[in-house]
Each structure stands twice: as structure tokens, then as C-alpha cells.
């Protein structure tokens, strides 16, 4: 299998050096007036340019009572703005994490199908025509090959790697490992089917063409072209024509 694009030490440095942020979304009603220095334009409304320079996004019409106003940014920057309210202090705050080091992945340039509700952190690699279903959780450093499907509620831990044209079933877990940095991540080869709710333990490699049965717990490496099942998982047979037909992928699901 190919070497990973990011080593554990590189990920550790990325997290350690990252600016920690506490994202908030503030919804205001009425016509709020601010007194905070540097935040005001001459009309007493927000100075949008100054706010943007502080990483704050402001949405809504501040010239009317009748629309909601939304402020989005880091709590450290937004808090002084709220403390400067002089009237109409009617607002709610939604917090997103606390001192988070890893943002979500910007998926705009990814040539894959990613359904709403998938949680994908930054520094994740996703191949062309992959499919990420709702509820999937993919941690930093994970790699997903082209044409691979990560089904509903599946979890790929840090640095977990899945090859091309594989299927990770609903609720399955590929255990992640970022620390200790010397530990090996899970590596799943090409054309592999991991059944629903199966668990592959840290450091295990699953060879290309193999099948992991639903509910199996895989604690040892799996060779190519075999079926494993049970707790702990054991080889129950080699892949035959019947098994290959039953586990074949559907290309239409990967069309964009």
C-alpha cells in the first residue's frame, strides 16, 4: 500500500500550531446599536470592513427592525461587539466547539458525492467519484480512494486509509491513531467490503479484494481475497465467484 500523505508527526504539529477557535453564530432582532470602538460606522451601525478584518461576518439588514441579523465569527472577536450593544439586546448565541484546532474540510474542489450531515475534518483526502453518506465521520489525515463509499454513520479515525472502489458499511469503525506517533493506522486495500458495524482495530491491514463480515471485530491483518467473520474475526473462506457477485459495487451510485 502507498505511503500516507501526512505522517502522525505532521498531524500533531498541525494541531499543535493551529490557532484555536471557538466559533459562534449570534442572531439578533430589532435594530441593535453598538458602541464598541473600531466596530462602528458613522451611522452607529456595524463597520463591515472593520469586522471582516477581524474575521467576523455580518448578515442581514441593520437599517430595519423587521429582519434578523446574524453575526458569525470567533468568540474572542464577537464578544466585545455584543458587550458594546447599547439597545435592543435581544440575541441568541450558538457555540460551535471550544478552542477547536481543526476546521472542517473545504469540499468545494472535491470531485465526489458528499451527502448532508457528513462530518469531514481538514487534511482529509477524498478521491474522485467517492461517496460519503450522511452521518459519516472522517477524522484528520484519513485517506479515501476513488470510487470508495463510506456509508451512513461509519467512522474513519485519524490517518485511516481506504483504497479504491471499496465499501465501508454503515456504522463500521476503522480505528484511528494519531498518538502515539509511532503507532500504525488502519489500512484497507482496494475492492474491499467492510460490513455494517464491523470494527477494524488500530494498526490492522485489510488486503485488497477481501470481505469483512458485518459485526466482525478485526484484530489481526487480513490477507487478500478472503472472507473474515466473527469476534475476533477469523478467515472463513476464500473469495469465490458467488461471493464476488454478492459483494459487487454499483457504478451508478458513484456517478456525478
From Swiss-Prot:
Q: MF terms per GO, please? A: tetrahydrodipicolinate N-acetyltransferase activity
User: Which SUPFAM superfamilies does UniProt cross-reference here?
Assistant: Trimeric LpxA-like enzymes
**Catalyses which reaction(s):** (S)-2,3,4,5-tetrahydrodipicolinate + acetyl-CoA + H2O = L-2-acetamido-6-oxoheptanedioate + CoA
**Which EC numbers characterise this protein's activity in its record?**
2.3.1.89
Q: Does the keyword Lipoprotein apply?
A: no
- In UniProt terms, what function does this protein have? Catalyzes the transfer of an acetyl group from acetyl-CoA to tetrahydrodipicolinate.
Q: What is this protein called?
A: 2,3,4,5-tetrahydropyridine-2,6-dicarboxylate N-acetyltransferase
The organism is: Lactococcus lactis subsp. cremoris (strain MG1363)
Amino acid at each position: 500500500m502507498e505511503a500516507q500523505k501526512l505522517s502522525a508527526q505532521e498531524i500533531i504539529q498541525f494541531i499543535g500550531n493551529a490557532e484555536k477557535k471557538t466559533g459562534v453564530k449570534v442572531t439578533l432582532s430589532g435594530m441593535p446599536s453598538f458602541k464598541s470602538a473600531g466596530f462602528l460606522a458613522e451611522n452607529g451601525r456595524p463597520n463591515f470592513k472593520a469586522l471582516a478584518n477581524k474575521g467576523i461576518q455580518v448578515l442581514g439588514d441593520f437599517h430595519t427592525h423587521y429582519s434578523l441579523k446574524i453575526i458569525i465569527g470567533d468568540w474572542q472577536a464577537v464578544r466585545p461587539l455584543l458587550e458594546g450593544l447599547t439597545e435592543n439586546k435581544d440575541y441568541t448565541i450558538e457555540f460551535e466547539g471550544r478552542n477547536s484546532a481543526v476546521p472542517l474540510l473545504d469540499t468545494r474542489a472535491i470531485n465526489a458525492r458528499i451527502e448532508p450531515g457528513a462530518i469531514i475534518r481538514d487534511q482529509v483526502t477524498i478521491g474522485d467519484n467517492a461517496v460519503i453518506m450522511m452521518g459519516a465521520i472522517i477524522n484528520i489525515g484519513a485517506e479515501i480512494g476513488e470510487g470508495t463509499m463510506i456509508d451512513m454513520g461509519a467512522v474513519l479515525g485519524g490517518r485511516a486509509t481506504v483504497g479504491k472502489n471499496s465499501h465501508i458499511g454503515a456504522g463500521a469503525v476503522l480505528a484511528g491513531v494519531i498518538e502515539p506517533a509511532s503507532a500504525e493506522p488502519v489500512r484497507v486495500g482496494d475492492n474491499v467490503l467492510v460490513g455494517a458495524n464491523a470494527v477494524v482495530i488500530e494498526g490492522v491491514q485489510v488486503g485488497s479484494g477481501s470481505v469483512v463480515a458485518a459485526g466482525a471485530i478485526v484484530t489481526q491483518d487480513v490477507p487478500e481475497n478472503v472472507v473474515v467473520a466473527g469476534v475476533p474475526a477469523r478467515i472463513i473462506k476464500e473469495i469465490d465467484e458467488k461471493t464476488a457477485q454478492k459483494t459487487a459495487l454499483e457504478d451508478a451510485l458513484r456517478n456525478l
